[in-house]
Amino acid sequence: MGELSRENFYAKIATTPRAVQGFFETVIEHFNKRNDMHAHHTDTNGGDLRLALPAELARHHTIRNFSTLYWQSRNQEIFVRSYLTPEEMSVFGFAGVKIPRNINEPLNSEVRLGELDWRYRAQDFIRASEAAALKMMG
């Protein structure tokens, strides 16, 4: 979750389309302005972005991620996992949302954001992520 993870994340998206970089920048900027949730990076999948609640709001002993996302260059997609269920994600207009195959996955859904999503739907993703955080808070 340190500076190296952040650098790896930005190196991974350095050659992506500008709209992908803009999507991530919009999401990061939004959540880093808040004091009740934040964005952080890990080296998972070569560098990813995670949106989390601090421990005291998550009623947990450590931070809890309510969303994880990373760029898949081969598919030209942003792969997302969310605390929302597939049905709850569909309320925000996201199609093709599935239950994760890994039964030990703590997040409840996964979706691949294609070009129309990462070009035009950053705000919809932010709203869905805020709903996931509220759900996690109980």
Where are these regions (language model features)?
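Charge-biased C-terminal accessory regions appended to nucleic-acid-, cytoskeletal NTPase
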Residues: 100-138
